[in-house]
Amino acid sequence: MDQEIGSIPHDRLVRHLPFRQQIVNWKSDYKRLLLLAYQSFGVVYGDLSTSPIYVYTSSFAGRLNNYRDEQTVFGVFSLIFWTFTLIPLLKYVMIVLGADDNGEGGTFALYSLLCRHAKLSLLPNQQAADEELSTYYRAGYIPQIAIYSPLKRFLEKHKRLRTCLLLIVLFGACMVIGDGVLTPAISVLSSISGLQVRAKKLVDGEVVIISCVVLVGLFALQHKGTQRVAFMFAPVVIIWLLFIAAIGLYNTIYWNPRIIHALSPHYIVKFFEHTGKDGWISLGGILLSVTGTEAMFADLGHFNETSIRIAFVGLIYPCLVLQYMGQAAFLSKNIHDVSSSFFESIPQSVFWPVFVISSLAAIVASQSVISATFSIVKQCHSLGCFPRVKIVHTSRWIHGRIYIPEINWILMVLCLSVTLGFRDTTIIGNAYGIASMTVMFITTWLMALVIIFVWQNSVIFALLFLIFFGSIEGAYLSSSLIKVPQGGWVPFVLSFIFMVIMYVWHYGTHEKYLFNLQNKVSMKWILTLGPSLGIVRVPGMGFIYTELATGVPSIFSHFVTNLPAFHQVLVFVCMKSVPVPYIPPDEQYLIGRIGPRTYRMYRCIIRYGYKDVQKVEDNFENQLILSIAKFIQMEGEGSSTGSYDSSPEGRMVVIRTTDTSGTRLVTRDADESECNSTPIRSSKSVTLQSLQSLYEEESPHVSHRHRVQIELSETEDINCEVKEELMALLEAKQAGVAYIMGHSYVKARKTSSFMKKIAIDVAYSFLRKNCRGPAVALNIPHISLIEVGMIYHV
């Protein structure tokens, strides 16, 4: 091939190379797409693919068990087929997957889209500069020409409606957490119960014990991460799908080929004519055929919509339809085996291989839902709706694969309680169906708003979408609610508990922010103090953490009032969430100045998305110093580049942290001896320096941090004022950095209502005392931390 290219004249070669390169790129993209589709089987479809184990058993568990005839079985299969076609295929694959938020999916992604394209967010600290983020608006959306509908104006005007919208989203998140409890219980218990088909002497209690052992092992291994065994997830699910599809095809041909006629919706009409109200009640079991569908949208961020569509249409849909059809064909001739129809329908020669692979598939399904629960809790925390918890990243290569110890053990206890308490997949299925269908129903409502506000389509189209899918899901949900006394109460109890936790934390955090906003220090008072601020300025740099994006927090005045000395350089650091999934590193830092140049006071706003990691990295100090230096240089040159957020304090500039050109600073690796031999005087006493050395010896994660020496370049001419400020910045950095944070005690005012006192003084106080501290959550070095105690009367 190379010889052929070499013989082509140059002008022809130029014409042929772009086309060849286009073919190479197409092949590369095609292979990557197929790889993503392959990997999605182990992450997205585990739950959906294990549903055939218990769908028919749950459907015939109630009064429908009195209708043991072929017509009823045909009607149930027809309902399963059309439900599986309309909800997963038509609604999710064809429509909902297109409503991604920069590649992310789930209820929080829809809510985030709505908050950005309509002013529905309740997050504090929102700024005009946030709207200039490259990930803020969808491609092609222009705010200036956006349609401003009366509905949009109505929602933006009424805060209570925006609060209700947030509560609906949180309720959906709580139901997802409920899935994290119920999915492992029903998947593992139903797969292990297959033993009773061959081991007749095995009693229910022994099956439950075996299931509990498997569940304990599953949750106990979560801290190890799944990267070592994740490569097995996709093959397990694919082999499982091929097995059950082959068995379904065999059963269809062997038992009753006429079952194919039930693909006609006419059998649904005949089913309800035959069963009446009892048929409607059975919908609570039939809906289990689509549980796990939401994972296609929720896990969109790990793949892309095309790969998920390929996997569903290419393998998931045909395999599951064949299995449901074959199982119905078997039941039409063996209705007495309905209590364990899946395992009874397996030919004896392949029973044990199928049993083993079903158990593995159940574990994969459980693992996927547990990981999704960790992800949803992290998103709630990022939006200020969940207490601080320990978040461990279990993979270096896959972003977003996390483990939360507290949530893991809570899920394990709840899952074991459900398994031991109910001991029946039918009862657990009643709870599971309610949780899953509620999330789908909430997605439908949010999707209708996205169609109007984000896609800017007609309200009529949104209403058609809402009425069509809402009526289907509403029918299933209404049927499930009948079964609340038979286990259906579990997701509501779990959701109520987590909703209280989320709302109390959000309410307390918001009240605390309002207190800071109302009691921030006046800039006039700061300016009257002069460059020294009326206190002793000691060598070093102070990072003052605050929730405010503007103004000086009250913690500063509280500190200097009790200890009238502060560092020569002050940086007010605000780490805030923006309703986007990720923020590019080059757009995270907003740098500004507080007061005149001689005050040496700066503001740094670090913006995070709801999927980003909020913590102080090892190189955070150096990044911040370089960003401030670049701001000083840009300000000195009067640069108009970048993005500015005008405010009474001055302008905020977006600093690209990956581009340090123009900072007049150079960085190089430095060993410990170089750092200690610096001529800059330190603000730390000899005793404190010895304590720091001892702390670093006992803390490997601190002592092994990458040390970088920052120096001022002398190769270029620098403005005298800029050079002086840069030198002061470097001197402060080399003298030592201290992290100042508020240690708050939030109390309700005496005039507050009784409910507010309960919420703040009891519930919020309990959560604050038992969650991780902000310094620990942000990975701030303990030896450099100064905490300032303050009482907030809200």
Feature-to-residue mapping (PLM):
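The structured alpha-helical core of multi-pass membrane proteins
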Residues: 1-794
